[in-house]
Amino acid sequence: MLPEKVVKILEEMKNEKIRGASWMAKKGAEAFILLSEELDETSLEEGIIELKREILEINPSMASLYNLAMFIPITNDREVVKLRAEEFIKRAEEAKKEIASIGAQLIDSGDVIITHSYSSAVFEILKTAKRRGKQFKVILTESAPDYEGLYLAKALQDESIEVEIITDAQLGLFAKDATLAIVGADTVTKDGYVVNKAGTYLLAISCYESEVPFYVAAETYKFHQKITSKEVELVERPLYREGSRVRNVLFDITPWKFIRGIITELGIILPPRDMI
């Protein structure tokens, strides 16, 4: 049985509706740190196996959780577990800073950038561009049904970035007004497809039709080396409106052909030439 403090983190991860894969991975790493502090050497290995299983069950297709689970060794050495989890968090933070710097170079003053949902990587890119003196506007969706787009809007306004909030249904209408699109990612599959908040695929298609460059910001620990786009399990959460059940699949899958590039801490990954 996992310690109560660890179970509390797992419940927080399961119930989170606003923050995405980066936050989930960090909380998961914190759970491993707590586990190393709460269990002794005689029960640590068993605890690690159980915690890995619990984390992977939260979202079986989320690469950040899979890669975190693979990064932590099964050992009875408490210090090793703690150091590995801390190293994961450190690398993740460094990756996001590098992505912010690389992504900000894509933005010019006068740009109109469109995005969907909340991505901490996208926020850092926009914040960095603003702090480099660039003036631009961001069009963003409210991102129903959890409305995490409003969370992003507030964060951008706190950075004195001009925002325009639209309903999700207007993605196609407003995409043509943008000069650049940047979204985050929960997972990049083995075959290069992007799993992200439902609506991302629609935005990508709209940008493709309007010839608006569509970029994805994703740390390399969000790349899944095992699953392909056809093997992704799309999580659905119960949703009811006025007594009626509403389908609420949380994610969709965007093919490579609609993506101009994926911004990573190692640089921008471009699609295969036959997809350009």
Swiss-Prot record:
Record has Protein biosynthesis as a keyword: yes
Pfam families: IF-2B
Keywords: Initiation factor, Protein biosynthesis
InterPro entries, per the entry: eIF2B_alpha/beta/delta, IF-2B-related, IF_2B-like_C, M1Pi_N, NagB/RpiA_transferase-like
SUPFAM superfamilies (alphabetical): NagB/RpiA/CoA transferase-like
Gene3D superfamilies: translation initiation factor eif-2b, domain 1, Translation initiation factor eif-2b, domain 2
GO MF, one example: translation initiation factor activity
Assigned protein family: Belongs to the eIF-2B alpha/beta/delta subunits family.
Matching NCBIfam families: PRK08335.1
Subunit details: Complex of two different subunits.
Protein task: Catalyzes the exchange of initiation factor 2-bound GDP for GTP.
Official protein name in the record: Putative translation initiation factor eIF-2B subunit 2-like
